[in-house]
Amino acid sequence: DSKQDMCLYQNEFDQITRTMFSQMKNACSTNQINANFMREMIPHHQGAICMSKNALHFSICPQLIPILQTIIVSQEKGVREMRALLHCI
């Protein structure tokens, strides 16, 4: 990996993690563990999606690509399901 790619990757990764942890920490808290958990986990899943997409922008080993694609699909599904469930509880 080139120094420039590593710098670009790391800068984006750092921004993603700052955003993710900030959103998790500042998630609205209620008296419901279920709602609190989902409000904290949605940004966590979104972080995993963004991290995976970030890695896919660079030259990575071919074996990692389907793993990252699976993470994106599964975490997007999880976010949709948790958002829908939050509206029901």
What are these regions (language model features)?
Residues 1-89:
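His/Met- and acidic-residue-enriched segments that coordinate or traffic transition-metal cofactors
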